[in-house]
């Protein structure tokens, strides 16, 4: 149900989303050149503020005070990082931002499952929702922990590749565990609806396996190749966010 913007016509919501999309597209275009990249970041950030702000206010997801408080905290942290982080350390910061995006997507998908499988939720969830949530948990877990390791390697904490006997077998085992947990989630095997504390254990098994897999995938790679890894994880962060949108049916 519409919240604070209840007096506005439904078309206003569509126009706000359209404006956000235009800001995103223009921001991405500006990011293609170093001279305009700063403006591109500003346009993209403005698009995100419009999209998130309109959504949470229109559907009463958060109160305006909570929304503005979150914006202030985020702006303060971002400003502090912009001032204190050296230009040469920007790749590490970008890697951390990628990881936070993937981790946030995994948490949002988990929250959606809590809402679906809680005591007041449905006994059967749409398969498209559980499939998207499983994809989000897998990609988000790999992205978050892989990005943390990549940022640490770029920072020089552990630059050399780490190899150990049976590393490929171990990676395959955790990937297989994540896939099995995802299948259990999608087919809704072993889901308990008794209380909010026993919902969908398979999702968190999937996230845990994906998190370990993200670490195992990055530690054998040398520090010199971390920019490539971070670029790949950046794309994965976007995929996780897109999958979260499908999980939320938005």
Residue ranges and their predicted role:
Residues 1-64:
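N-terminal transmembrane signal-anchor/hairpin module of polytopic inner-membrane proteins
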Residues 7-21, 58-76, 129-144, 196-209:
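Structural signature of hydrophobic alpha-helical transmembrane segments
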Residues 17-28, 48-55, 72-81, 108, ...:
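Hydrophobic core segments of alpha-helical transmembrane domains in multi-pass membrane transport
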Residues 22-36, 75-94, 147-161, 213-226:
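C-terminal ends of transmembrane helices
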Residues 38-47, 67-70, 89-101, 162-173, ...:
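Cytoplasmic-side transmembrane-helix entry/capping segments in multi-pass membrane proteins
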Residues 54-58, 80-84, 94-95, 103-115, ...:
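Generic transmembrane alpha-helix signature in multi-pass membrane proteins
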Residues 55-68, 80-91, 106-124, 187-195:
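Transmembrane alpha-helix boundary signature
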Residues 67, 121-141, 240-250:
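Structural signal for the N-terminal portions of transmembrane helices
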């Amino acid at each position: 149900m519409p919240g604070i913007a209840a007096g506005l016509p439904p078309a206003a919501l569509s126009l706000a989303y359209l404006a956000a999309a235009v800001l995103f597209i223009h921001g991405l275009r500006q990011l293609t050149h170093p001279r305009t990249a700063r403006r591109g970041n500003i346009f993209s950030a403005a698009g995100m503020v419009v999209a998130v702000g309109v959504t949470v206010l229109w559907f009463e997801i958060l109160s305006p005070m909570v929304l503005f408080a979150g914006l202030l905290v985020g702006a303060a942290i971002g400003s502090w990082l912009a001032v204190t982080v050296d230009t040469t350390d920007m790749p590490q910061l970008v890697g951390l931002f990628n990881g936070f995006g993937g981790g946030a997507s995994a948490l949002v998908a988990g929250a959606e499952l809590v809402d679906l499988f809680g005591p007041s939720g449905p006994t059967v969830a749409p398969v498209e929702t559980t499939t998207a949530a499983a994809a989000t948990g897998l990609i988000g877990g790999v992205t978050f922990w892989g990005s943390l390791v990549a940022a640490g390697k770029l920072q020089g904490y552990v630059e050399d590749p780490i190899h150990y006997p049976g590393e490929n077998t171990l990676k395959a085992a955790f990937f297989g565990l994540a896939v099995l947990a995802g299948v259990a989630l999608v087919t809704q095997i072993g889901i308990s609806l008794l209380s909010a504390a026993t919902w969908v254990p398979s999702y968190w098994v999937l996230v845990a396996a994906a998190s370990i897999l993200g670490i195992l995938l990055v530690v054998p790679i040398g520090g010199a190749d971390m920019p490539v890894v971070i670029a790949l994880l950046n794309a994965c962060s976007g995929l996780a966010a897109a999958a979260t949108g499908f999980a939320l049916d938005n």
